[in-house]
Amino acid sequence: VSPGEGDGPVVTAVRGTDVDIRTEDGTVDAYLTRPVEGGARPAVLWYMDAYGLRPRLREMADRLARAGYTVLVPNVFHRRGRAPVVELPEFIDAGARPEIFRRLRPTMRALTPERAMRDAGAYLRWLAECPAAAGGPVAVTGYCMGAALALRTAGAYPDRVAAAAGFHGGRLATDAPDSPHLVAGRITAEVYFGHADRDRSLPPEQIERLERALTDAGVRHRCEVYAGAGHGYTQSDTAAYDKEADERHWAALLGLLARTF
């Protein structure tokens, strides 16, 4: 796949491999991609959307690797099995979505914040020992449910996360006692969120609550609503895809990484 416009320094070739990561709760299958040449690169931990580790995410991770980064995409649903944990069509249209989520919902609920952050520690330790990853802090980015995981990871491991981003995230600032936004006071990273417009999983009151939490905590951040873009706008294998919003996401993510590393 050719590099996208505005990706910054372009690497001519990347190498993607499937890797296994040991955790306290078993083995995680993951995708690692990095530039073929140039030695160790700054590392990015990439949190999947609910549809999981699949060709679209590998394609996106490869694009980020071509911009000069080592990217790790773990299957966060590993407790249910190796990816894909449910059968997916090549293209997920609006009609297929409800049934896929019906099958995924128990697995999503089973990934508690405690389990997810225990896993995050394993991912970060693995990257610290990975020869393709430069030493020092990493960046984290997440999509859909992964946006909340990115935010939580920045709060749980402030000494390891220098930048955190989330795109078309949902339920980021709820009334729950373990809502993701409540970690804001522990974050030292720079944070960016690109919210979907008219997203039922992230209504305006949650956007305002998240903004207030980050501001009150003194977190360097920017939160933007992508007008007209629906939930899932970065995923070209779904009916939610919005090319203009996706390219805006790339510009924002690459800008954040350029400021960080």
Residue ranges and their predicted role:
Residues 1-261:
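N-terminal cap/leader regions of alpha/beta-hydrolase-fold enzymes
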